[in-house]
């Protein structure tokens, strides 16, 4: 699991990476032997790395085009960091081209539906490479927040100041899962006219079935990887969140 979900930072060299649309300072990591995949190293608050890691992996397990993602073992005093596969993007195709290209139409709709299911309320960042659309940036999804993780990190201290019930509420606030399917429908069908109502409905039903088909063993692998660097309560939070998505997908 360590090799699969973690980047060995000592094997890479780093340079400052400047781009638009991603928050905070980032670095581009390349293998020191000048080969293999390059990664964008991203950190922006406690919840950024875990949301990117979980969002990208869950999307990939649903068959959505996304970059690979790895966690990085923190050095002493470091922030949480996620390494996201660098994909050099060409100019995005215009909506007219997407509407009339079956492959691009499907990729566009499924990319946005992944953000919908994971309740990522930020703008959907898209990349276009080798004739395919990819999505990224799930940092605002999954109902995870910086404050809750901070409380998890300091639960022993806060546990002496507040009741265990209050501590649990701060660490694991109730998840009110309500994906904005209507907003995505209006955008894709009514506003942008990317697809028909029938296409949207079929795609939503299909991506829900894909989510339900994700094996419990894969979910456990992802959560176990998180607990290598995050407090164990965070895995509990994601477990609750994933179960909420499953409930929605069964309806």
Regions found by a protein language model. Give the residues of each.
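Conserved kinase catalytic-core segment
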Residues: 97-150
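Alpha-helical context
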Residues: 35, 99-104, 180-183
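Acidic-enriched, low-complexity/disordered segments with a strong bias for Aspartate over Glutamate
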Residues: 11, 33, 47, 68, ...
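Conserved ATP-binding subdomain of kinase catalytic cores across diverse folds
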Residues: 2-93, 114-121
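Sequence-level detector for tyrosine residue identity
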Residues: 5, 12-17, 27, 39, ...
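C-terminal catalytic region of ATP-dependent kinase domains
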Residues: 132-251
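Short, low-complexity, polar/charged sequence segments that are solvent-exposed and flexible
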Residues: 58-62, 101-105, 153-157
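Short amphipathic alpha-helical segments, especially helix-boundary/capping motifs
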Residues: 28-35, 101, 196-199, 211
């Amino acid at each position: 699991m360590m090799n699969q979900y973690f980047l060995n930072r000592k094997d890479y060299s780093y340079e400052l990476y400047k781009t638009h649309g991603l928050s905070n300072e980032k670095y581009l990591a390349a293998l020191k032997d000048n080969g293999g995949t390059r990664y964008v190293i991203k950190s922006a608050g406690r919840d950024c790395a875990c949301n990117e890691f979980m969002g990208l992996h869950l999307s990939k397990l649903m068959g959505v085009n996304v970059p690979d993602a790895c966690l990085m073992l923190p050095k002493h005093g470091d922030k949480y960091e996620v390494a996201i596969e660098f994909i050099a993007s060409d100019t995005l195709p215009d909506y007219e081209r997407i509407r009339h290209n079956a492959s691009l139409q499907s990729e566009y709709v499924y990319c946005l539906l992944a953000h919908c299911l994971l309740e990522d309320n930020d703008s959907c960042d898209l990349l276009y490479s080798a004739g395919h659309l990819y999505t990224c940036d799930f940092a605002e999804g999954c109902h995870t927040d910086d404050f809750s993780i901070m409380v998890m990190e300091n639960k022993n201290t806060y546990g002496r100041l507040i009741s265990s019930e209050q501590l649990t509420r701060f660490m694991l606030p109730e998840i009110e899962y309500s994906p904005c399917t209507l907003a995505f429908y209006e955008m894709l069908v009514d506003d942008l006219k990317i697809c028909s109502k029938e296409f949207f409905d079929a795609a939503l039903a299909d991506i829900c079935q894909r989510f339900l088909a994700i094996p419990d063993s894969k979910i456990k692998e992802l959560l176990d990887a998180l607990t290598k660097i995050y407090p164990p309560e965070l895995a509990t939070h994601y477990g609750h969140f994933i179960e909420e998505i499953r409930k929605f997908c069964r309806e």
